[in-house]
Amino acid sequence: MLEIQTGASFKKEQANANKKGIRILRGGNILPNKYIFKDDDVFVSEEFVNANTILKKNCIITPAVTSLENIGKMAVIEKDYNNVSAGGFVFIISPYIQDFNHSLLLAYFLQSPFLIEAMRGITKKSGAAFYNLGKERLKELYLPLPPMTEQSRIVSKINEILSSIMSR
């Protein structure tokens, strides 16, 4: 149904702030249902980034190492990039079905209270304040997927409700 991988791994001294090379998205770039570029984003030379970690349309990004409160933040990539990757503490979830509504539905399901609680249950404490969401354990979660036409209908309804909430 999907592939899960971590983003680019590099040493701190290989990162730069001169906005040259590949932009690296970290946990702070991921908000519920969206991602943002920030002024303090780090960049690394292309030689340190595996081509399969470059973000493509329909991929979902989520923090892999984070605080308990941030488990379940998901963002769907809206277009193909040639110079943006995720960092090593971020999961890149690539659905085998390349359909934007399918990716949105997966992200919405993964952000549901039920699945957030399930993800919290499979995390391991890593250091004083961080939790590590294991890739293999994440792959074992069950996702209820309806037929594609129903997925589109559900996504439309969720978007309509979210739009109504945001306009208040």
Annotate each language-model stretch with its function.
Residues 1-14, 28-60:
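Sequence-specific dsDNA recognition surfaces
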Residues 1-9, 144-168:
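Non-catalytic DNA-recognition/assembly elements of restriction-modification systems
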Residues 11-19, 39-40, 121-123, 133:
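Short coil/turn segments at secondary-structure boundaries
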Residues 26-27, 50-111, 134:
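A short beta-sheet element
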Residues 36, 73-74, 121:
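Short, solvent-exposed loop/turn and secondary-structure capping segments
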Residues 83-91, 125-145:
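A short glycine-rich beta-alpha junction/loop motif
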